[in-house]
Amino acid sequence: MSKYLATSVRLCLMVCIVGWLLMPSYKELDGWCSSLSSLERDKSNWLLTGLSTWFCIVPSGTDQSSLVSYFSPLEKLSKFVQDLDLDFVKLWWLETITLINTLNTTEKLLSGVTFSVVLWYPRILVTVLMLVWKLWFPVRFLVVASSLLCLRILVWPFEVIADVILETCAWFTRKYHKLMDVIEDLMMIPQRVMEWCSGNTAKMVVPTVASCVSESIESKLDRILMALGRKGTVLEAAQPGSDFVECEQWPNGLVAIRRHDGRIVGMGFLVVLNGKWRLVTAAHVARECKRGIMLSAGIDSKTVTFQDLDVVLQTQVDACIMNVPAGTAASLGVRKVVINRTPSESKVVRTYGYNSGKFCMSEGLVGTTSANMGFRHGCSTLRGWSGTPIYRDNKVVGIHSRCNGIYENFGLSLDLLVGRLESEETDRYARTMEEFNTEDRPVTPPMEFSWEFEEKFERVRSTRKSFARIESEVATFTATKLSGFDWTDDAPMDFDELPVFESTMVSVFQERPLGGLPISNGNKAEEKKITSEALEPSKSSTPEAAKHTRRRRRNKKKSKNSETGHGPEEQSQQQSRPSSPIPDDSAPVSSPPVSPPSTGSVPKSWTQAYTQKLVLLLGSMDGQSKEKVDLAILEAKSFASALFPPSKPKSSEESEK
C-alpha cells in the first residue's frame, strides 16, 4: 500500500513540476495573443510580416530598432520551441507559426473586406495551440509513466484527446494551405523590406528579408478578392507587372464621374463628336447617376454638377454617350482629346483613376482583340475605374469596361467613332462580319461556332449603325434624360456568362443561344412579353414553326447596303424594332410601339430548310446528348427532303456534307 502511495505522490510532484515549468510558455503565448490584438486595434500600424517566403510593409517612420519589437513575440516563442527536445513539436510548431504569421498578414491585407472566414482563422489556431500546449506535455509524461507502471490503459483517453487535437490542427493547416495557395498567386514575390517615404522614392530598411514594390498592395488584394466570384456585378482586377503610380498631370479629356452624393462611380472623357461636346463612358457607370451627375477634373478637382443629361446613345457593348452643355470642358479645364484606332497587340497603353484618394495611372499591354468591339489590356484597375479612357500617345484608343477574370481586363474599342465619313466598311469588325455573311451556310455538328457567337455579330451590326448616326448631320436624336432612362438590368449587356473571352468560339453543345438586347432605352415589360412571344413557336416542330427560326445571313452586297444607310427613316426603324432572340431585318418602320417580329423567310433550298429545322430542334432541347443530336439530324434531313426532293444524288450528297 505504501508503495502505491509513494508512486502516486511522485506522480503528483512531477505533474506539478511540469506545470510550473510550462507556466512561462503560457505567459509568452498570452503575450503574443495580446500583441496580435493590439495590432488589430491600431490599424495605422498594421504589419504584414512573414518568414522567408513572405513580405513585410513597414509603416512610414519606422526605424530598424522598433522593427525588431514587431518580431519579439515570435522570436521568444520560436526560442522556447527550439529548447524543447521534441522533434515532432519543433517541426509542427515551425509550420504552424508560419501559417499563423501568414494569416496575420492576410488579416491585415483584408482589413475592411467582408471575408469573415479568413479573419477567424488566426483566433481558431491560437485557441488550438493553447489546448495542445496544455495537454501535450502532461499526456506525454503520463504515457511514459504508465508504460513503466503497466497502467497504459488508464491514460489511453488522454492519448486519444491529444491525437484529436493534433489532427484538428493538421486539418486547419491543410485548409489554410488551400486558401493561401489562391492568395499567394495573387501577391507579388518580394525580396526586401521597403519603407515608402514622400513621393515615389523608397528607402531600404532591412535587406534580404522581404520587399514590397508598391504601397497599394492592400488595395490590389482587396480588388482581386472581390473578383473571385461576385456574379452579376462589374468587377475590376489588378494585373501582374502593372502598378499604380501617382500622377501630377491630368490627361486630355479625362473626367471623373460622381453621383449626386459625390461618390466616384467611374471615369469618362469629353470629346467633340459631330461638332458637339459629348461625354463617353461605360453604360453601367451612367446608370448609377439617375439622381444627378457630377463631373470633376484636374488635380485640384474642379467640379460641375448637372441635375440631368441627355443620353444620346446606349449601345449593347456597355458604352454610353451623353450630351454635355457648351462650356463644360472650359469650366473643368479639360483639353481636347483625339480618338484613335485600337493599336495592335503588345502595344503599351495607360489608364487613369483614383487609388485611396490619390490620382494614379497604370500601364499595360494590349492583348487579343475580339469581334465584339473589345480587346484585352494589361492595365491594373480598381473599383471606380470603369469607363476610364485607355490612352496611347495621348490619344484615346478605347474605354475600360470591366474584368473578365482575375487577370483579364476588358476594354471597348472606339474604332467605329474614327473615320466614319470616309468609309462604312473599313474597320476590321466589318471585315470579320462579312466573312460570316455567306447565304445557305451548311451546318454540320459538331459546330465550330455557336449561334450565340453569330448573334453577337448582329448586335455589333446594330451598334455600328447607331455609331454611324452620330457622325450624320441629318440625324435627329430623340435623346432621353438620364434620370428617366430605363436601363436593361436583367442581364449583362454583352458579356459571356462562361469564363471565356468574347471572340472564343463555344460549341453549341455547351451553350444555348441567347437573345439580343435593345440599343435604345429598353422597356422591361415589353421586352419580356416579346421574348415570350418569340419563343412560343420553338415548342413545335411543324413547318410553320420553322418560319420563326433564325433567318440566314444576307449576301455581302445586301449587308453593305443595309449598313451604309443612316438617317431619320433608319433611326425610326431601329427604334421600332423589338429585341428578341430572332433577329429580323423586316420589322415595320412606321409603328411606334414595339411589335412582334416577322415570321421570317420561307426556305429556298434543301440546305436552308435543313439548317432551320436543325437549329429549331437543337434550341428546343433541354439537354443535348449525342443520341438526341443524332435524332435531330435525322429529323431535319427528313424535313428538308420532304420539302425539296433531291433531283440528283450528287447534289444531295453535297448538301448532306
Curated annotation (Swiss-Prot):
Pfam family, one: Peptidase_S39
Cystine crosslinks: none
Basic and acidic residues bias (residue ranges): 560-569
Compositionally biased intervals (Low complexity): 571-589
Residues of the active site: H284 (for protease activity), D318 (for protease activity), S386 (for protease activity)
Primary subcellular site in the record, as a coarse category: host cell
Region of interest: Disordered: 513-605
Protein name as it appears in the record: Putative serine protease
Organism field: Mushroom bacilliform virus (isolate Australia/AUS LF-1) (MBV)
